[in-house]
Amino acid sequence: MTLWIEAPLRRGVESANIRWGNTIAILTGDFLFAKSSDLLADLGAEAVRLQARTFERLVVGQIMEVQGPASGQDPLEHYLKVVADKTGSLIAASARYGGMVSGAPADTTDTVTLFGEKIGVAFQLADDVIDIASESNQSGKTPGTDLREGVPTLVTLNVMKSTDSADRELQHLLSAPIKDEATVQQVLVALRNHRAIDESRDQLHQVARAARLALGPLPVSDATGALMSLCDAVIDRSA
């Protein structure tokens, strides 16, 4: 994904494609995918099937993002489906593998899978806010990356749905990739002072609350407490 968006920084370090080039980055991803498939084969058909279906969702989500919402479809609804497929699916699968290999009851495995999906979505929505609100030395990546690529995010979609005439110029700037660096900085300042940032944070907290509620069927334990704490860590992070 770093290669896809041509990001120079990820989590405070050089991205693989910047450090080693596109070819090595792609081949490394292929190797890791092959290695994980080999390891999962030892866990049986169900584990392999879960990986395949997760990868299917990831690819479908990427296709949906590239195509954009259908005519008449709510762009925000479309975006949240993309996020669920691209990010939620990965964390859901990780959580489900934990339940499967630990021998947890089926209902417990289903519960942590649902939690994983929701916390995965929350993680991406937090990234959307961080991309706008944080400085580079806080977030470990270049602020405004999505603006430069013209990729819709929670924050920009909240701006785009505004009917306030005062937002027209900003909406125009957000309607295409922004290549001029001075304009990127101008838009970042405008977004940081826009009500869409607070609205996006509220939506992020709603998803995190849904993740906590998903844990309701589980008994109180250190493990459940750790998952609750994960919700706080995801929404409070700056990188």
Question: Which residues does each predicted region cover?
Answer:
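All-alpha prenyltransferase/terpene-synthase fold signal
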Residues: M1-A239
